[in-house]
Amino acid sequence: MATMENRTFDEIAIGESAEVTREVTRADISLFAVVSGDVNPAHLDDAYAAGTRFKGVIMHGMWSGAIISSLLGVHLPGPGTIYLSQSLAFKRPVTPGDRITFKVTVKEKREDKKIVVLDCSGVNQDGKAVVEGEAVVMAPTEKLVPVAPAEPAVTIETVAYVRK
């Protein structure tokens, strides 16, 4: 049985980092649209998106925030982390087929409330920044090693979006 392990405030070191790489698919874009309710045609409609400044469908900017959130909650610090704030600057569009490497790096620790400040970034397959920012979390003080939950199964069905 697979487990997850956190890093407690005392274990975390300045400069410590965690990263994950994700390849963007049309299914990812559709799933994010469903979960967020953001059905802007720039994300879902090829014909509409072709007429935008990006010349095609783009991933939702906040998808980057969601992946950064997963790094914080699963890897560094991991289970038991309390997410306090996040700032993000979107540097360039992310399109289907892009491979984005997200990284969080500890830059500051505040002993009084067990606060950890992390630089956050996402870089595409060409080494170009797509997102930059900072996260502030309250790190766990107790060691946790929970069983890793199974990834949920999801089925996508295309449904016409009707404006009211």
Residue ranges and their predicted role:
Residues 19-21, 87, 132-136:
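Well-ordered beta-strand positions in beta-sheet-rich domains
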Residues 2-81, 144-164:
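Hot-dog-fold acyl-thioester-processing enzymes
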Residues 82-84, 116:
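Short, basic and Ser/Thr-rich N-terminal targeting/leader segments
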Residues 3-14, 95-164:
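HotDog/MaoC-like acyl-thioester-processing domains
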Residues 8, 54, 84, 89-90, ...:
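Short, conserved secondary-structure segments in the cores of folded domains
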